[in-house]
Design a protein with these regions (language model features):
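Catalytic-loop region of hydrolases
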Residues: 24-88, 102
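N-terminal cap/lid subdomain of alpha/beta-hydrolase-fold enzymes
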Residues: 73-147
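Conserved acidic catalytic loop of the alpha/beta-hydrolase fold
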Residues: 153, 164-183
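Conserved hydrolase catalytic core segment
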Residues: 183-220
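Alpha/beta-hydrolase-fold enzymes
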Residues: 211-307
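Short alpha-helix in the alpha/beta-hydrolase fold that links the catalytic acid
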Residues: 334-337, 360-370
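Short beta-strand/loop motif that positions the catalytic acidic residue
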Residues: 350-352
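Catalytic active-site module of serine/aspartate enzymes centered on a nucleophile-bearing elbow/loop
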Residues: 377-422
Length: 422
């Protein structure tokens, strides 16, 4: 096989795939049998944990965090060999709450459909770790935390971050948990970037990387969307040069607008047409005296923006979108992704979605091409979906089969079941 020149079909391509599923001879429309599980299966009530790390963390920008906190959740049990750990890496606005429910909150985690007993990321087989990364705003050290040098919130003074900073912080949590090697590092979007970075920074610390709806670097269009969102935030009078917490303010309108911009890019035109079309919420296009005329899609975006601005921090949004812009997996390898992936030792599963235009399937095929050229074991599946970039978070039978089948084989290779000898 000439890996340099092989073209990847638009629907599915698998190279050196683990032998559980012979997808080279199987269409994703064909049945692939996995254990049945009811749609309402859940790990149940979960409790977040917090780790205070005393070990200094030197960031890529040169700044040293003498200490930092990480909030995380775990699901399932670690086996006696401590070999069944899976790290979940969240995307831009994600957090540690990937699955289950809180005692006082009935809303499930952001990946509830995929994490739990009998689900694709099976907590009967794996010990799953989901962490809120530094720079975010859900309890881990970030812009809303107190700067020990000033006694005030970090705000816009929080140091710039790179994906490798998240990886190094996650590694400290890994050591705290007594895990020497992840069975898999799994993530979508920015989470997939972290999985790839893990494979280069610590190639002996993971057996598999699952990269979903991601890219080796952002396109100019993606960077442009991020800059427009940041400008929306900074244009809010309540932004106060990023020191809004000191003034007991928050740029809610700017952050809501930023989220509205982002949300449009996460959906496909087809889905928006199906969901909203040109339906009106209030007003009448015929009656010119009716003001304002409001389309359903306007109402939806306004709701999403307002909800997001009430729960996320503007400085965190700016910080993490800049981290996305800066991400370039092969930059220190003379911009040669094949040379970059030559350092990886793990197996890869790369997944993309047909209607995703924010992280288009072409980006995933570029990852797969580079991995094949580097001689790595890689499986690639493009999932048919009309859900756009958000498809990686939403139910999809073929997606479940591809992800669940791959991880089922990973579990079989581990041998020792979860909870043995514990």
């Amino acid at each position: 096989m000439n890996r340099q020149s092989e073209k990847i079909p638009a629907s599915i391509c698998c190279v050196n795939f683990l032998p559980l599923l012979d997808l080279m001879h199987t269409s994703l429309s064909d049945p692939i049998m996995l254990p049945d599980h009811p749609s309402d299966t859940s790990i149940g009530i979960v409790t977040p944990q917090s780790l205070h790390i005393e070990q200094p963390l030197k960031l890529a920008c040169g700044v040293v965090l003498e200490t930092h906190d990480l909030v995380y959740e775990t699901y399932g049990e670690l086996n006696s060999a401590k070999s069944n750990g899976i790290l979940l890496c969240h995307a831009l606005s994600g957090d540690h709450h990937a699955a289950g429910f809180y005692q006082d909150d009935s809303r499930p985690g952001w990946w509830e459909h995929y994490v739990g007993p009998g689900k694709p990321i099976d907590t009967d087989k794996f010990f799953v770790v989901s962490v809120n990364n530094i720079g975010s705003c859900f309890g881990s050290t970030g812009p809303t935390s107190i700067n020990p040098d000033t006694g005030k919130p970090w705000g816009s003074d929080f140091p710039s971050l790179r994906a490798r900073d998240w990886v190094e912080s996650q590694k400290l949590l890994m050591e705290h948990l007594g895990i020497e090697c992840w069975a898999a590092v799994v993530g979508g979007s920015l989470g997939g970037m972290q999985a790839m970075r893990w494979s280069l920074e610590h190639p002996d610390k993971l057996l598999n990387a699952v990269v979903i709806a991601s890219s080796m670097k952002l396109t100019a269009q993606n960077i442009a969307f991020n800059e427009i969102a940041r400008r929306a935030i900074k244009s809010d009078p309540d932004f106060c040069d990023g020191r809004y917490l000191e003034h007991n303010k928050a740029p809610l309108k700017g952050l809501a607008l930023a989220r509205m911009i982002g949300h449009v890019t996460y959906l496909s035109d087809e889905l928006m047409g199906q969901k909203f079309g040109r339906q009106l919420r209030i007003g009448d296009l015929i009656d010119r005296n009716t003001d304002p005329i409001e389309f359903q899609v306007e109402s939806y975006l306004n709701y999403q923006g307002d909800k997001f601005s009430d729960s996320f921090d503007a400085n965190s949004y700016i910080l993490i979108t800049k981290m996305l812009d800066y991400f370039d997996l092969s930059r220190e390898y003379n911009s040669d992704p094949v040379a970059a992936f030559a350092h990886a030792k793990c197996n890869f599963l790369v997944l993309s979605f047909s209607s995703d235009w924010r992280f288009a399937p072409e980006r995933s095929r570029e990852i797969t091409d580079a991995l094949m050229s580097a001689g790595k074991s890689v499986s690639y599946v493009e999932i048919e979906s009309d859900k756009g970039h958000d498809a990686f978070l939403l139910p999809n039978e073929r997606y479940e089969k591809a992800l669940g089948g791959y991880l089922s084989r990973v579990a079989n290779r581990l041998g020792a079941p979860a909870g043995d000898g514990q």
